[in-house]
Amino acid sequence: MRFVYHPLAKEPTLKIEGESYIHLYRSRRIKSASRLDLRNLKDGFLYTYEHAEIAKKHALLRLVGVQPLEIMANKKTHLILSVIEIKNIEKILPFLNQLGVSKLSLFYADFSQRNEKIDSAKLERFQKILIHSCEQCGRSVLMELEAFSNTKEALKAYPKASVLDFNGETLPASADFEKGVIIGPEGGFSEQERGYFKEREIYRIPLDMVLKSESACVFVASIAQI
């Protein structure tokens, strides 16, 4: 663990309780003499705290140091992924986070699984997964998450995003990944959706194999950092 997340990190004093307390003081057995590095995952600063008190159900921390320390990928990457199974989204989130993806937009394509609902509770769970990933890899800013109800909404929001499809030019490392790369579901895009893409750059993955949506995400995120 590179640091501990706390939404109020930077305050002169902090209280650690609940799941964080159990993890730090019962699982990891942090001692009172230890100092802890904390982040709020918003401002890029690393805050160092010492212990003022460790009680049975909470710990009180006192701020003793601050340093600017941003840890992010060199290039920004925005993936626009059609909704796939929730368990598969949760599985790839830590990988995308470690590869420096700056934003993940989810949308319901024509062939998306409609029984998979992306609501505020799901987005909150996704964010929790990302927080744990940041604590492990050291990333200093959270990945942005959002959801759209259909393809046209996503296209309207990102008019310069390119599309990953079977028929297109080989995806170059020089592509503008910050503008967004649209990745379809397992069944690909419908003919109607392909009609929406006529004015956009279309790319394909330079492999003879057909990748799952989650594999395509990891591939694009990796290429973006070359």
From Swiss-Prot:
EC number per UniProt: 2.1.1.193
Main localization category: cytoplasm
CDD domains hit by this protein: RsmE-like (cd18084)
One GO BP: rRNA base methylation
Keywords in alphabetical order: Cytoplasm, Methyltransferase, rRNA processing, S-adenosyl-L-methionine, Transferase
Family: Belongs to the RNA methyltransferase RsmE family.
Listed GO MF terms: rRNA (uridine-N3-)-methyltransferase activity
PANTHER family the record matches: 16S RRNA (URACIL(1498)-N(3))-METHYLTRANSFERASE (PTHR30027:SF3), RIBOSOMAL RNA SMALL SUBUNIT METHYLTRANSFERASE E (PTHR30027)
Gene name as annotated: rsmE
Lineage: Bacteria, Pseudomonadati, Campylobacterota, Epsilonproteobacteria, Campylobacterales
Catalytic activity: uridine(1498) in 16S rRNA + S-adenosyl-L-methionine = N(3)-methyluridine(1498) in 16S rRNA + S-adenosyl-L-homocysteine + H(+)
Protein location: Cytoplasm
Coiled-coil residue windows: none
Ranges annotated as spanning the membrane: none
Name of this chain's protein: Ribosomal RNA small subunit methyltransferase E
Function in brief: Specifically methylates the N3 position of the uracil ring of uridine 1498 (m3U1498) in 16S rRNA. Acts on the fully assembled 30S ribosomal subunit.
Gene Ontology annotations for the cellular component aspect, listed alphabetically: cytoplasm
Record keyword Acetylation present: no
Top-level EC class as recorded in UniProt: transferase
InterPro entries, alphabetized: Alpha/beta_knot_MTases (IPR029028), RsmE (IPR006700), RsmE_MTase_dom (IPR046886), RsmE_PUA-like (IPR046887), tRNA_m1G_MTases_N (IPR029026)
